[in-house]
Amino acid sequence: MKKIILNLIITVLVCTGFLFISFGQTIVTTKHNLSLTGPGTVKAATESEICKFCHTPHNSLPVRPLWNHTNSGAVYTLYTSSTLNAIPGQPDGSSILCLACHDGTVALGNIVSGPAVTFSGGVTVMPAGTKNISTDLSNDHPISFLYNAALATADGQLVTPAGITPPVHLENSKVQCTSCHDPHKNLYSSFLVTTSQTSALCMSCHSRTYWATSTHKTSVKTWNATAPNPWPHTPYTTVANNACENCHNPHNAGGKLRLLNYAPEENNCLNCHSGTVATSTKNIQTQLAKTYKHNVAGYLGVHDPIENANIITKHVECIDCHNPHAVNATTATAPLAKGFDLGVSGINQSGTNVAAVTNSYEICYKCHTGQTWSSPSAVPRRIVQNNVRLEFATTNPSFHPVVGPRNNAEVALNLIAPNTATTVLYCTACHASDGAGSPAGPHGSTFPQILKLQYATTFGTTESATAYALCYSCHNRTNLLAGTNSFREHSKHVVSAKIPCSECHDPHGISSTQGTATNNSNLINFNSAVVTASGGVIQFIDQGVRRGSCTLICHGKNHNPITY
């Protein structure tokens, strides 16, 4: 009997404001003090008791811990995602208690043990805003799901239940609101049980592959104060300190799938990569405003992280080429993937899907391997091939050295240093943003095909270092036009006749399934719009070192044949 009386006295003392001991902070100084004495704007008009809005020692609901608030009884819309291995159910346990106020359906003063408490300012339910998460939980971190070893194994990027340590905790083996929030203390803002700085709270459960070395984990870049604020829902001022919340929001996320800050996928990247946080060399937003670009703004909700690497539905998003959990500044030599390509899916040279690419070109193969929606070649070719994987194969009669070193020693004689016979190129050697200091990737360009330099393809173009700047960035212009160690009629064609390189040369390569070393060496694959048959024949024949013949009609000139 004495013990019961003592417990009752303690309860009364706590709830009337005389005793508050809670590891350095009490509920008294938090917004969960809904009494007249509370520090927040949402509080009772006259009620001075503090605990009664949630607890009562008598006449409570049959739910621990002595619950005193009327529950909602709502049916909630739950979070779903193709990448979610957990199975969330309707809220239960302590979460249903939190939602009694935070779903905005029940008056804050509706208590079980007595008449409803009147709130000041005419407030009844939780006011609209970030704290009223409504009955739509599809944009909130999932709750009330079983978190066990099987889930951690199935997901592959979760800490095992045994590895989750206080103050983060599971409730009866489930994730609940109280796994992350302590309603009685607000030491870390938002009543979090531990700091969200560097996403320490997230990392209590999540163990993302590659994250340890990601730039998004380590960067100390700050916002330059040019609107909009990239981190409106956090108090932190660097990329590293915001960590997960650079892109994600655990409550009221703008992009429900994967709790992204914004529904348009690219906006979760461009909020920093617009020159306001990332440096000018990583200002992608400027590049995407150019005429020729990977049009990430043209698609919404099409990309799925678990999609087949051999993309079926046409789309492009930043995430198709970059893994934000993995990106870093690691350098590499072609064709190996650099740090900004780590952890991205692709298709290898054998045509096999890979979860994480080894070589950079494997990312490009996801979209540029002859899909039905692939754009035709910018220059119509006698041999038609839209599958760049086949065009770059090192078994081809000729190819640009993207997969491996070139097979033509003659070409190497006219390369500009540091290019040599063994040089391998990235696709971005040609396809990249134009302009000095631009980002390295093929984000956007003023030149067609997202080329980083001008590549004239129009008949009648006056030859100049600028007109064919792309070709001349590797190939020695002086030697080519002089015929030094090269086809000696280059000047006659390109300078005198004003015939562009593209009339004869197919820059990617000619597949061994369609061409031969005799007819298609030196990237010879004629422009079918201007080259017609001579005597029923269109043919180039390689006759040895810098020797060959052409049988065709080109711009009215009959080669029947012409030998050089």
Task: List each model region and its residues.
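Positively charged n-region of N-terminal signal peptides that target proteins for export
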Residues: M1-I4
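Bacterial N-terminal signal peptides
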Residues: I9-L19
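C-type cytochrome heme-c attachment and multiheme electron-transfer modules
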Residues: S22-K52, T56-Y564
